[in-house]
Amino acid sequence: MAFQLAGFFLILALGLGHYFSNDQESRCRQLELYATKSIIPTTPAMSSFNTIATPHGALTIPVNWLYPEVPKVTSAHTNCLFIAAALQVDTWEHSRPLKQSCHAQDLPEHGQCHQGRVAHYSAYVNSVSAVQQVIQFAASHRLRLAIRNTGHDLAGRSSAPNSLQLHTAGLKGIDYVESFTPQAPAGQSVPSDGPAVTVGAGVLTGELYSAAAEAGYTVVGGSCSTVGIAGGWMQGGGYGILTPSRGLGVDNVLEIGVVTAQGVYVTANQYQNQDLFWAIRGGGGGTFGAVVHVTFRTYPDSPATVSKLNVVSPHGLNSAFWEAITDLLRAIPVLVDRGDAVQAFVMPVMPGNTTFLTIESYLINETHVSGLDVIRELKKSMEARGLSVESSEESFDWLSAYLAIPKGLDQAGMGMMTASRLVSRELMTSAQGPSLISQTLAQLSYDPGNVLSLEGMVGGPAVRGRETADRATHPSWQSAVMSLTLGHSLPSAPDWTAYSRAQRELAMTQLPALQALEQGTMGGYLGIPFPYESHPSRVFWGSHYDRLLTLKGRWDPDDLFLTRLGVGSERWDEEGMCRVGRAQAFLWWYSSIVDRVKSWTA
């Protein structure tokens, strides 16, 4: 103990010297790119940009800037793939600090329309060389660079005010091979990793699922068909219905092609650039480099059964409903341990004081009669508690056929604030664990439009069977069996008071209640984050953060790649434009050291 405390004070002394030394200067990124309001920029920097980006460089304006001259803007605003400036959660197109926005629902015919957090310029790239040129341009001019694939981000990480956007949606290509051999240093012979598929950064999950169904294989992917599978989904960990049986998205990555902050294209796998390979697989998107393609392990196709329960509690959030949630929580680890997946959504406050619950179960690799028995028993118990339950079951000869069913365009242009925490298998399978979770959720307050998600597809045999150090995600993924998400619906048209109220409720009441379930030992999912986490390093990476921060300094010493909540973001202001002062940086560093000492003495 004395040795540990002595080490702490030594670190503290060194830290004081580092953070208050004269060479730790604050600085801001340049704004010369945006020195003109002309539609055709005339600054020297923009002349250079137009040269390297033509024909793909463009001025970016908020979607509704064209309203009402283009009436279709209002309806197209809910299309995920509409335009480079559009984000799935359009509250991140607004600037809360400046109270600036541009929204059709709140825009008078001749009213003001502000840029908000929408990038000023966008470079739509469709080749590795184009990515390299844009990165070199941004680095040479010290610009704020934001990487956007499809704009599916719940914390505003694919956009930033006063930024240049690297739009990777044009990096298409799906290449399936029966035997994939990773690239290795010259003279080194490596074995084949078996069947695999290489996808460009712009390939959507639905596009890959369609290609897989045609070729007869399956691949681990998410539930949203318009998410770029090689982007933030994979780089944040990535889970889906195959995760319990096949692992997380990052567990199935064999090779990554990435452009570094120096504009150099490199290959990262288990044979070369291993540190970068580790960091990208869970360290967060837009942080260590611009990923241009990823090779995923594939699996043979298999039968599957999809079961759905639509549950209505006619008396709302009464004790019978929460007892039914306890029943569901007991069933989830049973199914997940079999390699199956469960996804449940609760709409707590609906018209007429009713509560809706939908449960989808994915039984993989066989008809799973015993798995269906679990679900049928769950249905009976819910009905016995006075809930109305409608059920359906559909079997598929091939799982790939189900995954490839067109899902339509995912809803965009919506307002939402979320927070998530992982829940351990140990708690879920304990005698009192499910009741404790249910009672905790019952004590929270809910408003119309709130959503509660219980996803039993983050853990399972394939996740537990891997070493914690194999991936950069929070170590608690190893023991997790469920992700619990709280969602607050927000007005799409800017309502600054509503935004603050949702943030306060999540930060002060709801998240602390979830944290207390397991004394803060479980992390959160970076893909569904609370945008205002006070300690993102602790929540999303835990003990892996120190190594990630070291690798960030090695591969991107100037923090060209930066996102909200991302590795290294504590060194910058909220939008990544200016480095924070020495005192503020020290306070963050000091709090992390105190946390470490507390863990030593616990």
Swiss-Prot record:
Pfam family, one: FAD_binding_4
The protein's required cofactors: FAD
Top-level EC class as recorded in UniProt: oxidoreductase
Flavoprotein listed as a keyword: yes
Keyword annotations of the record: Alkaloid metabolism, FAD, Flavoprotein, Glycoprotein, Oxidoreductase, Signal
PROSITE patterns: FAD_PCMH
Glycosylated residues in this chain: 353, 365
Molecular function (Gene Ontology), one example: oxidoreductase activity
Biological process according to GO: alkaloid metabolic process
Signal peptide start and end residues: 1-17
Keyword Signal: yes
Pathway where this protein functions: Alkaloid biosynthesis
Annotated FAD-binding PCMH-type domain residues: 114-301
Enzyme Commission code: 1.-.-.-
Sequence similarity: Belongs to the oxygen-dependent FAD-linked oxidoreductase family.
Function: FAD-linked oxidoreductase; part of the gene cluster that mediates the biosynthesis of paraherquamide, a fungal indole alkaloid that belongs to a family of natural products containing a characteristic bicyclo[2.2.2]diazaoctane core. The first steps in the biosynthesis of paraherquamide is the production of the beta-methyl-proline precursor from L-isoleucine. They require oxidation of a terminally hydroxylated L-isoleucine to the corresponding aldehyde by enzymes which have still to be identified.
Name the record gives this protein: FAD-linked oxidoreductase phqH
Lineage: Eukaryota, Fungi, Dikarya, Ascomycota, Pezizomycotina
GN (gene name): phqH
